[in-house]
A protein has these predicted regions:
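TRNA-recognition modules of translation machinery and tRNA-sensing kinases, especially anticodon-binding
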Residues: 8-171
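Short, small-residue-biased leader/transition segments that mark boundaries at the very start
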Residues: 1-7
């Protein structure tokens, strides 16, 4: 584990080549489909070039967290990700290799999860504000990543592909 931050999170660094079977067990190998880069090691064990790290991290936490007293546990990493994008483009949009910060929260119940989620969302808002980036937090489709709820921070740009509606009278 790495350094502890203001919301009690810890920085980690996970393998870029986890075993493919973790993604197969979760069903995400099928969901990602041809977006996955796969290969085999010298013993012919299938590996995946990680498009995300949920399976590997969940297996690690399952093996090492033995009590609710160890929770909440908030882990994050800034890591290079790889996806075989169907329409790669230049610049920072839709590239096959990109850096991403992902954060994961393990909590005792759904209420505690909501507290962790709100703290992380506020931490992101603070970072964007310090950088002078006028982002908008929007509801998002969790897609292949999965999950009950998902949000994205959008920075308005003419080169983007998404269209959003903004209500000037809403929060």
């Amino acid at each position: 584990m790495g350094s502890e931050r203001c919301i009690g999170d810890r920085e980690i660094r996970l393998s870029v080549l986890p075993p493919l079977d973790l993604s197969e067990q979760s069903g995400r190998a099928e969901i990602f489909g041809s977006d996955l880069f796969t290969l085999a090691d010298r013993r012919d064990r299938p590996l995946v070039v990680a498009p995300a790290h949920e399976e590997l991290l969940t297996a690690m936490v399952k093996a090492n967290v033995n009590s609710y007293r160890d929770l909440p546990l908030i882990l994050y990493q800034i890591h290079t990700k790889f996806r075989d994008e169907p329409r790669p483009r230049g610049g920072l949009i839709r590239v096959r290799e990109f850096d991403m910060m992902d954060a994961y929260s393990f909590d005792v119940d759904e209420e505690a999860l909501d507290v962790s989620y709100r703290a992380m969302a506020q931490a992101y808002r603070n970072i964007y504000a310090r950088c002078g980036l006028p982002v908008i937090m929007v509801d998002a489709d969790s897609g292949a990543i999965g999950g009950k709820e998902s949000n994205e921070f959008i920075l308005l740009a003419d080169s983007g592909e998404d269209t959003i509606l903004i209500c000037e009278q809403c929060e």
